[in-house]
Amino acid sequence: MAKQSMKAREVKRVALADKYFAKRAELKAIISDVNASDEDRWNAVLKLQTLPRDSSPSRQRNRCRQTGRPHGFLRKFGLSRIKVREAAMRGEIPGLKKASW
């Protein structure tokens, strides 16, 4: 199990990313616009740097919903590999069965 503080930190990052999504997209559009003046682009870079670091989606980490485990995460299920295996062995995931050949 992950520490509660780590789970809370992830929740905070998701909230910040949602809050600043439009602002970041607007600034990035100005930065990548070749028709914008150099001064406008530079000002957009400076404004982007003033936003909170945790508002960047790349700082988010996928975590298991049950345990908070950051590694071995399977997006399709939202769980870590360990919890997916346990659920599959109990027959809780429809259509998923152990491979045998």
Swiss-Prot record:
GO terms for cellular component: cytoplasm; cytosolic small ribosomal subunit; small ribosomal subunit. Keywords: Ribonucleoprotein, Ribosomal protein. InterPro entries: Ribosomal_uS14, Ribosomal_uS14_bac/plastid, Ribosomal_uS14_CS. PANTHER family: 30S RIBOSOMAL PROTEIN S14, SMALL RIBOSOMAL SUBUNIT PROTEIN US14M. NCBIfam families: PRK08881.1. Belongs to the universal ribosomal protein uS14 family. It comes from Escherichia coli (strain K12). Part of the 30S ribosomal subunit. Contacts proteins S3 and S10. GO terms for molecular function: rRNA binding; structural constituent of ribosome; tRNA binding. Coiled coil: none annotated. Binds 16S rRNA, required for the assembly of 30S particles and may also be responsible for determining the conformation of the 16S rRNA at the A site. It holds the Pfam family Ribosomal_S14. The keyword Ribonucleoprotein applies. One of its GO terms (biological process) is ribosomal small subunit assembly. This is Small ribosomal subunit protein uS14.
